[in-house]
Amino acid sequence: MSKKLTFQEIILTLQQFWNDQGCMLMQAYDNEKGAGTMSPYTFLRAIGPEPWNAAYVEPSRRPADGRYGENPNRLYQHHQFQVVMKPSPSNIQELYLESLEKLGINPLEHDIRFVEDNWENPSTGSAGLGWEVWLDGMEITQFTYFQQVGGLATSPVTAEVTYGLERLASYIQEVDSVYDIEWADGVKYGEIFIQPEYEHSKYSFEISDQEMLLENFDKFEKEAGRALEEGLVHPAYDYVLKCSHTFNLLDARGAVSVTERAGYIARIRNLARVVAKTFVAERKRLGYPLLDEETRVKLLAEDAE
């Protein structure tokens, strides 16, 4: 019987595979976020005309999902392996299935289904056509073709593939609890993450200072606006991410009502839309440096008309 891949070997295998497909291997973005989609390597790069192919691991924090380390499959923080390709390759689904084969999962021997599940992120004004990928009855991946990001229509279309690494590893290693996943030889997932899970859950549900978080949200929102007034897209987006995480902490604490919740989401969305528009304008001002010369000259000429 062959040795099962460790968590980090799964990551290395996916990195090598998508590197071979022409993706840049980015590093996790150093700001709290609820999903890999919110990284600027996806959110910003999915808009505008320039090509972009990237893959990266993204730790994703969802305070309301914390369970004190007591639930075998629900986590405050989980890991996503994010792949974004723009324009979307025509064979992206075939490439995905090939990536599973590299992990030792033969599509001919397993029940792999693409279940329609169109995607939407109201807090960033983003949406797309999507599918959940189910492997023998368990969701392991979200597949999305972005139609709108930051309130802007995407052209060309970006394909996003988001692997749920904990679920994938649980399946490959045949364990029922994420905490039993072998991260590396001789080191279990729980030995690294169960204490942080407990502490972050306790903080999110019991300890966080609601008044401070409310004040911080207002300050982060204001600072994002100040950065945008100066045309500073990336610092502004950092504060949008901070607003989002702060809201998630408030939500986990039960500090916002249903009515207030919609208002906070709208405030984040409005900022994200301005960031998106400003980013596209910035790339145009820079002359769309990632485009090939012929396309770049043609597009700039059209924009000038």
Curated annotation (Swiss-Prot):
The record ties this protein, via Pfam families, to: tRNA-synt_2e
Q: Name one GO cellular component term.
A: cytosol
Keywords for the protein's UniProt record, in alphabetical order: Aminoacyl-tRNA synthetase, ATP-binding, Cytoplasm, Ligase, Nucleotide-binding, Protein biosynthesis
Q: Name one GO biological process term.
A: glycyl-tRNA aminoacylation
Give the catalysed reaction(s), semicolon-separated.
tRNA(Gly) + glycine + ATP = glycyl-tRNA(Gly) + AMP + diphosphate
Q: What is its EC number?
A: 6.1.1.14
Top-rank lineage group of the source organism = Bacteria
Which GO molecular function annotation, any one, does this entry have?
Answer: glycine-tRNA ligase activity
The top EC class is ligase
Which compartments does it reside in?
A: Cytoplasm
* InterPro entries on file: aa-tRNA-synth_II/BPL/LPL (IPR045864), Gly-tRNA-synth_heterodimer (IPR006194), Gly-tRNA_ligase_asu (IPR002310)
User: To which protein family does this belong?
Assistant: Belongs to the class-II aminoacyl-tRNA synthetase family.
Subunit structure, briefly?
Tetramer of two alpha and two beta subunits.
| Identification of the protein by name | Glycine--tRNA ligase alpha subunit
- Its source organism is Streptococcus pneumoniae (strain ATCC 700669 / Spain 23F-1)
Gene responsible for this protein: glyQ
